[in-house]
From Swiss-Prot:
Belongs to the complex I subunit 4L family. This is NADH-ubiquinone oxidoreductase chain 4L. It comes from Avahi cleesei (Cleese's woolly lemur). The chain crosses the membrane at residues 2-22, 29-49, 61-81. Keywords: Electron transport, Membrane, Mitochondrion, Mitochondrion inner membrane, NAD, Respiratory chain, Translocase, Transmembrane, Transmembrane helix, Transport, Ubiquinone.
Length: 98
């Protein structure tokens, strides 16, 4: 495995670990999810280019589109929660609270 692939997998693992550690704040979770999506995009692009997979050239672009949609929905949720509660804690999103 080349050092580039190792660094990208390490970036994904770090972002995933950050999602697990900072799961109480919505903004931190969104940033870690974006880091995961960026590392997946770069990894899939490098794999497709190295293996000359001409059939799946559009897969990284599709992944990037889904990442943009996820970011837009996440930011809309962040704005809604911060306007409603004044905080970005995920525990405020519990539907079982009265």
């Amino acid at each position: 495995m080349t050092p580039i692939f190792t660094n990208i997998i390490l970036a994904f693992a770090t972002a995933f670990l950050g999602t697990l550690i900072f799961r109480s704040h919505l903004m931190s979770s969104l940033l870690c999810l974006e880091g995961m999506m960026l590392s997946l995009f770069i990894l899939s692009t490098l794999i497709i280019l190295n293996m000359h997979l001409t059939v799946s050239f559009m897969m990284p672009i599709l992944l990037l589109v889904f990442a943009a949609c996820e970011a837009a929905i996440g930011l809309a949720l962040l704005v809604m929660v911060s306007n409603t509660y004044g905080l970005d804690y995920i525990k405020n999103l519990n539907l079982l609270q009265c």
